[in-house]
Amino acid sequence: VGALAGDAWVEVDGVKTPRSLFGWAARGVRVLGPVHVFKNELASSSGDAPPADFGLTPKGRDLVRAASRLGIVVDVSHASDRAAKEILALAAENGSPVVATHSNARALADHPRNLRDPELRAIAKSGGVVGVNFHSAFLTRNQTATLADVVRQVKYLVDLVGPEHVAIGSDFEGEIRPPAELADAEGYQKLARALVQAGVPKDTVEAVFAKNALRVLCKSGVRD
């Protein structure tokens, strides 16, 4: 079991069957990550070599459908390209939001952990959010990222999907290599100031830092 946005997030290791989701939902789980660094019994991962991109397995499709019906938001961060596309399509069947809790735009940093523009737009269309990750390799093609690279990602995403669909997904607990200015949570104020100085409206900054993610979480939950 992982922890993201409090205790609202669980990795697939804690969920063995679609039926078990009922128990997790009753305990407050609101976000499900079907896959992590490597492929598993549910889906292929962005960490796998391209030939291994088989997408969702039948069990994975069943779990995503069950999560969507229960109001549990599915997270496509770490999912392979095919798996992410299939998750978005399945969630759309139930009108459920999808999130990328800690992924960036591949257009700015060509890394398999980042998402392509079509998937980013689909997340926004679902009503979900994309959380900007602070890991240097996901921010820029350069070895070491700067605060300006984070600002660039945020602005790109705001322009692409709209200010209501961008959030912060720093991934500090993920042993990342962040920009020096964002070595820990104390750097958030620096980022907020840098965004405003770059022309991002203050109300958009407030939405990106908290309101957008809270909106999605507050709308999640067990459905009748």
Language-model regions, residue ranges each:
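Histidine/acidic residue-rich metal-binding segments in metalloenzymes
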Residues: K16-A26, G47-V73, A79-V99, P112-S126, ...
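Conserved, mostly hydrophobic/aromatic
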Residues: G28, V74, H102, V130, ...
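Short acidic/histidine-rich active-site segments
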Residues: N133-F134, V161-A185
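Active-site beta-loop-alpha junctions enriched in small/polar residues
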Residues: G2-G6, V37-K39, I72, S77-A84, ...
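Acidic-and-aromatic substrate-binding clefts and catalytic sites of carbohydrate-active enzymes
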Residues: E11-G14, S77-H78, R106-N114, T140-Q143
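Active-site mouth loops of central-metabolism enzymes
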Residues: V1-K16, A49-F54, E181
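Mid-to-C-terminal alpha-helical segments outside catalytic/metal-binding sites
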Residues: A183-D224
